[in-house]
Amino acid sequence: MQPRIKEVLTYLDGQYEALQKTFESIPIEKRSKSPAPGAWSPAGVIEHLASVETSIGRLISTRVAAGRESGLAPETDHSSVMETYTVGPLIGDRTRKIVSGERSHPVQQLAPDAAWNAFAAAHATLRSAVVDADGLAIGEIVHPHPVFGPLNLYHWVAFVGGHEARHAEQIREAAAAV
């Protein structure tokens, strides 16, 4: 596996595992409870992540397929992706409110297990799309993020990991408040 893909997948896998431990540490009876009117329950946060990762997985698959068709070069760069990922501190800052698009807001009617299963499936599909891009110079493919601006596909994968970490903290906060 190309070192840059391996690096972002290692980060992504670590954040996924941490999120799973956080969610599983919440008592079952608290997973569907919102901490305040209009706030997302832990299961609602997971439902949001399922929606977002479905969209980003589709984005990566589509952009990589288009890159292949247009002759995207093989990856020759072995430098660290994470050292150039400047969005990480911004997304990790829970004091900075970031409002997601309405499309990715949870309906909050899924049972916690159903929400987790939807998220796990979306995450697996996204991860598979990243593995499928192994060996290609996906740092050359740039797509705008609605809040953080242009990100290359490596940075999109790092964003997903940071997004999971941000929401793991939100889940801890929500569970503590109910």
Enumerate the predicted regions with their spans.
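Extreme N-terminal tail/first-helix region
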Residues: M1-E17
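Charged, low-complexity, helix/coiled-coil-prone segments
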Residues: M1-I5, F23, G57-E75, S100-N117
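Hydrophobic packing residues in well-ordered alpha-helices of helical domains and bundles
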Residues: I5, L12, P42, A115-F119, ...
